[in-house]
């Protein structure tokens, strides 16, 4: 699936749900308390971050989309901290203050990146008059492209069915991060996003993929949903829609440090993408990529457009697309699982010029991903002569990796990339110049695998040799 990042600035999303403040106390631990067999933490750093529905709103704002937040808070320092923190990141807060209740707060104590204990300060908001929240939803509907209902079972969504019907009457899609086992509460929603445990608590454990799909489609029918997205941790995500084949998206996470708030990121990106005009399938692809980024961070976190762009282009932690052969094989495997077409080309690319850039842009247009295999310094010297390359391999790869058209850059030591091409087996092998397809290294292997081999023209008047000669001539004249 080929997906480009939308202009999130055109999107408006309202988040309604259980807001909370996440507090983090950090410090070293070097001894056990004499009072009890517990570690003593010397707190040296304190952080406060919006959590729950507030974290969903922050994820939406981090993308550059218009983000509004409605929820229930107390009249206390935690509520003031939430307002201040959210205002700093351009979330428009419209809280309903309840003087009789504290703002929900969760305190985590950490040492050496390990969470030692969590303390919750809360009192459920059940029984609170829902009308102020309903009125705020009605006021926002003309200006938003999606409504997110973030349910942590703290009472803000006690009248969730009224909220769903209010938004549906206005033609606004409703996305819900559910809680508990009573999914009938969410009847008629556009999309539910349970994680696997939440799904199995309602539908039962599935022994096979087919059984999971069958049980999921039954939930879609039973509760009149437009779609169901099951987030499955290391197994990625599965999107189920009536009348359509299941869409399985493998995880893109490289390393997992903390899953706190990952569900908030998923539904936030989903809503922003839908509000920006993406299809549901495209929005799920972007949300899956965002989840892979956020679980690599510690604590409740958000994802920026740059991080998301890097993730969907396979550049999350690869130094502008520069990869080893093994890393490339893994990236290509994931791309193929998403149905993407792989294009591959190669060259020395010693002094990058307009002809190179034009050629690579045209090569990228042939598929969804472009691999550029680059001759090592020793290989370039053997092919081009003792004075080449002008630019060493690391510099050549960094420049290539920074190009919009290029997804992945990989070096090779041989005179030709035939072995590397045979290992990767791209869908389309491309070479620039006056070659015949059968003369191109790796062509036989690509053809044998059912792929294509194409020759593209270079831009006239552009060559590295000409540039070097011009520089030499200019230097001699001076």
Swiss-Prot record:
Cite a single GO BP annotation: ADP-L-glycero-beta-D-manno-heptose biosynthetic process
Q: Region entry Ribokinase: which residue ranges?
A: 1-318
Q: Which E.C. number(s) belong to this protein? A: 2.7.1.167, 2.7.7.70
* Positions bound to ATP: 195-198
Q: Does the keyword Nucleotidyltransferase apply?
A: yes
Name the Gene Ontology molecular function terms of this record.
Answer: ATP binding; heptose 7-phosphate kinase activity; heptose-1-phosphate adenylyltransferase activity; phosphotransferase activity, alcohol group as acceptor
Identify the InterPro entries for this entry: Bifunc_HldE (IPR023030), Carboh/pur_kinase_PfkB_CS (IPR002173), Cyt_trans-like (IPR004821), PfkB_dom (IPR011611), RfaE_dom_I (IPR011913), RfaE_dom_II (IPR011914), Ribokinase-like (IPR029056), Rossmann-like_a/b/a_fold (IPR014729)
Top-level taxon of the source organism: Bacteria
Q: What class of enzyme is it?
A: transferase
Pathway membership? Nucleotide-sugar biosynthesis; ADP-L-glycero-beta-D-manno-heptose biosynthesis; ADP-L-glycero-beta-D-manno-heptose from D-glycero-beta-D-manno-heptose 7-phosphate: step 1/4; Nucleotide-sugar biosynthesis; ADP-L-glycero-beta-D-manno-heptose biosynthesis; ADP-L-glycero-beta-D-manno-heptose from D-glycero-beta-D-manno-heptose 7-phosphate: step 3/4
Q: Region Cytidylyltransferase: which residues?
A: 344-478
What chemistry does it catalyse, as a reaction equation? D-glycero-beta-D-manno-heptose 7-phosphate + ATP = D-glycero-beta-D-manno-heptose 1,7-bisphosphate + ADP + H(+); D-glycero-beta-D-manno-heptose 1-phosphate + ATP + H(+) = ADP-D-glycero-beta-D-manno-heptose + diphosphate
> According to its UniProt record, which residues of this chain constitute the active site?
264
Which Gene3D superfamilies would you find in this protein's record? 3.40.1190.20, HUPs
Gene Ontology CC: cytosol
Provide this UniProt record's keywords sorted from A to Z: ATP-binding, Carbohydrate metabolism, Kinase, Multifunctional enzyme, Nucleotide-binding, Nucleotidyltransferase, Transferase
User: HAMAP family recorded for this chain?
Assistant: HldE
The family classification in the record reads:
In the N-terminal section; belongs to the carbohydrate kinase PfkB family.
Q: Could you describe the subunit structure of this protein? A: Homodimer.
Q: What does this protein do?
A: Catalyzes the ADP transfer from ATP to D-glycero-beta-D-manno-heptose 1-phosphate, yielding ADP-D-glycero-beta-D-manno-heptose.
What is this protein identified as? Bifunctional protein HldE
Origin species: Pectobacterium atrosepticum (strain SCRI 1043 / ATCC BAA-672)
* Gene that encodes the chain: hldE
């Amino acid at each position: 699936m080929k997906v480009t990042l939308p202009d999130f600035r055109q999107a408006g999303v309202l988040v309604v749900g259980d807001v909370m403040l996440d507090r983090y106390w950090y410090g070293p631990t070097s001894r056990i308390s004499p009072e009890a067999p517990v570690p003593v933490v010397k707190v040296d750093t304190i952080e406060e971050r919006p959590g729950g529905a507030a974290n969903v709103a922050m994820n939406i704002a981090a993308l550059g989309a218009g983000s509004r937040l409605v929820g229930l808070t107390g009249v206390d320092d935690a509520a003031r901290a939430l307002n201040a923190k959210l205002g700093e990141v351009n979330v428009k807060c419209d809280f309903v203050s309840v003087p009789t209740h504290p703002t929900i707060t969760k305190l985590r104590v950490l040492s050496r990146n390990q969470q030692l204990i969590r303390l919750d300060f809360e009192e459920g908001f059940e029984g609170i008059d829902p009308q102020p929240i309903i009125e705020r939803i009605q006021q926002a509907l003309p200006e938003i492209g999606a409504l997110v209902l973030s349910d942590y079972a703290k009472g803000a969504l006690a009248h969730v069915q009224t909220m769903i019907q209010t938004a549906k009457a206005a033609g606004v899609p409703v996305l819900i991060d559910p809680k508990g086992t009573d999914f009938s509460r969410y009847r008629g929603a556009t999309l539910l996003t349970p994680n696997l445990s939440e799904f199995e608590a309602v539908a039962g454990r599935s022994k096979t993929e087919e059984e999971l799909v069958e049980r999921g489609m039954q939930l879609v029918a039973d509760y009149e949903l437009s779609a169901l997205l099951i987030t499955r941790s290391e197994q990625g995500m599965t999107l189920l829609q009536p009348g359509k084949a299941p869409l399985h998206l493998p995880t893109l996470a490289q390393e997992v440090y903390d899953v706190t708030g990952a569900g908030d990121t998923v539904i936030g990106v989903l809503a922003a993408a839908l509000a920006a005009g993406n299809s549901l399938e495209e929005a799920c692809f972007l949300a899956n990529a965002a989840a892979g980024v956020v679980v690599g961070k510690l604590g409740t976190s958000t994802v920026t457009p740059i991080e998301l762009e890097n993730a969907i282009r396979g550049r999350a932690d690869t130094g502008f697309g520069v990869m080893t052969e093994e890393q490339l094989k893994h990236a290509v495997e994931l791309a193929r699982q998403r149905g993407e077409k792989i294009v591959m080309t190669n060259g020395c690319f010693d002094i990058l010029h307009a002809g190179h850039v034009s050629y690579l842009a045209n090569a990228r247009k042939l598929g969804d991903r472009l691999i550029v295999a680059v001759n090592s310094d020793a290989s370039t010297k053997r092919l081009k002569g003792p004075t080449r390359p002008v630019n060493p391999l690391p510099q050549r790869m960094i420049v290539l990796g920074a190009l919009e058209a290029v997804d992945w850059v990989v070096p090779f030591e041989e005179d030709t990339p035939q072995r590397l091409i045979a290992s990767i087996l791209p869908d389309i092998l491309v070479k620039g110049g006056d070659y015949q397809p059968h003369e191109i290294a790796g062509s036989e292997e690509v053809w044998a695998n059912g792929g294509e081999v194409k020759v593209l023209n270079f831009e006239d008047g552009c060559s590295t040799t000409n540039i070097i000669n011009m520089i030499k001539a200019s230097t001699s004249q001076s």
